Amino acid sequence: MDLDVVNMFVIAGGTLAIPILAFVASFLLWPSALIRIYYWYWRRTLGMQVRYAHHEDYQFCYSFRGRPGHKPSILMLHGFSAHKDMWLSVVKFLPKNLHLVCVDMPGHEGTTRSSLDDLSIVGQVKRIHQFVECLKLNKKPFHLIGTSMGGHVAGVYAAYYPSDVCSLSLVCPAGLQYSTDNPFVQRLKELEESAAIQKIPLIPSTPEEMSEMLQLCSYVRFKVPQQILQGLVDVRIPHNSFYRKLFLEIVNEKSRYSLHENMDKIKVPTQIIWGKQDQVLDVSGADILAKSISNSQVEVLENCGHSVVMERPRKTAKLIVDFLASVHNTDNKKLN
């Protein structure tokens, strides 16, 4: 074979090998960096742009797609210890002609974390209202979506600021009072009584604990490689002390049942979505809400746990689109 041809293959092979080796090295040595790159790439692919808004010296980080139009804008609030990118799996299946805004909740990701911040549910509601006013999102009423802790905040927000919200989607929200505790809540109470706050199941610090948390939150058993579990833990560990502080704040007497205490004040059309096999917050919470919110509808998803957004993103997006179409008399075809 001609020497130039051999050299060409060597150069081509080396050129291809460099990114492959870089990827393998990242996967093995810096899995957390790979996870960040993954979210960055996914945001770009879906057309989500990251921006910052400021209220005095407080910074909010958010991503958005689209512009306000004749359809309601959609504001999405994530759950405890998550971030705005958790919604990307749902955004993928939402129409591109909708104005979507996903914000990092107080203290999370790119939003300001302050030791002076009021992390109670009502405190978070007031912060989100500041964000809404920064963006002038309430220039006309918007659709509000929240899951878990974000659902807790969303429900109380709709009660506190009814003129801001035209409709509401609550995805397995926290903040309700049940007649009996499920095993997860019983375990939390035992930890609380023993003051073992280092062992909160929703705040993993090892790959094994991360795997246990994923099993707790999901009905579907995802097979997650050890390196990815390590990466997920590495991303969270620097923030775990904040997560503990936040967790203790939202489960104390001041905040624990804020949604329950305010649900009868919610007057906008409300959609309640819950995974039937939710091990974190029992699915019976859907009936509790439906009995107090007169203009509500319940969607219970079979074979689905607490992580509805991650387990059933396509179904969640369809339910939201159908709900908006029915509530706002919009042709469903135009939303798709």
UniProtKB/Swiss-Prot annotation:
Positions in the Extracellular compartment: 1-8
Chief location of this protein? membrane
Tissue specificity, in the record's words, reads: Widely expressed with higher expression in small intestine, liver and brown adipose tissue. In brain, expressed postsynaptically in cortical neurons but not detected in microglia (at protein level).
- Null mutant phenotype: Abhd6 partial knockdown inducing a stronger depletion in liver, kidney and white adipose tissues protects mice against hight-fat diet-induced metabolic disorder and obesity. De novo lipogenesis in liver is reduced and associated with a reduced expression of lipogenic genes. Accumulation of phospholipids and lysophospholipds in the liver is also observed.
Stated consequence of mutating residue 148 to A: Loss of the lipid hydrolase activity
Which residues span the membrane? 9-29
GO CC terms for this protein? AMPA glutamate receptor complex; GABA-ergic synapse; glutamatergic synapse; late endosome membrane; lysosomal membrane; membrane; mitochondrial membrane; mitochondrion
Q: Give residue spans on the Cytoplasmic membrane side.
A: 30-336
Query: In this record, what's one Pfam family?
Result: Abhydrolase_1
Which reactions are catalysed by this chain?
Hydrolyzes glycerol monoesters of long-chain fatty acids; 2-(5Z,8Z,11Z,14Z-eicosatetraenoyl)-glycerol + H2O = glycerol + (5Z,8Z,11Z,14Z)-eicosatetraenoate + H(+); 1-octanoylglycerol + H2O = octanoate + glycerol + H(+); 1-decanoylglycerol + H2O = decanoate + glycerol + H(+)
Q: Has keyword Lipid metabolism? A: yes
Q: What is its EC number?
A: 3.1.1.23
**Annotated localization:** Late endosome membrane; Lysosome membrane; Mitochondrion membrane
Question: Which residue positions does the secretion signal occupy?
Answer: none
Summarize induction of expression: Up-regulated in small intestine and liver by high-fat diet.
Q: Name one GO biological process term.
A: negative regulation of cell migration
pH dependence, entry free text:
Optimum pH is 7.5-8.0.
Q: How does it sit in the membrane?
A: Single-pass type II membrane protein
Q: Which GO terms describe its molecular function?
A: monoacylglycerol lipase activity; phospholipase activity
Q: Which residues form the active site?
A: 148, 278, 306
Please state what class of enzyme this protein is: hydrolase
Q: What does this protein do?
A: Lipase that preferentially hydrolysis medium-chain saturated monoacylglycerols including 2-arachidonoylglycerol. Through 2-arachidonoylglycerol degradation may regulate endocannabinoid signaling pathways. Also has a lysophosphatidyl lipase activity with a preference for lysophosphatidylglycerol among other lysophospholipids. Also able to degrade bis(monoacylglycero)phosphate (BMP) and constitutes the major enzyme for BMP catabolism.
By what name is this protein known? Answer: Monoacylglycerol lipase ABHD6
Source species of the chain: Mus musculus
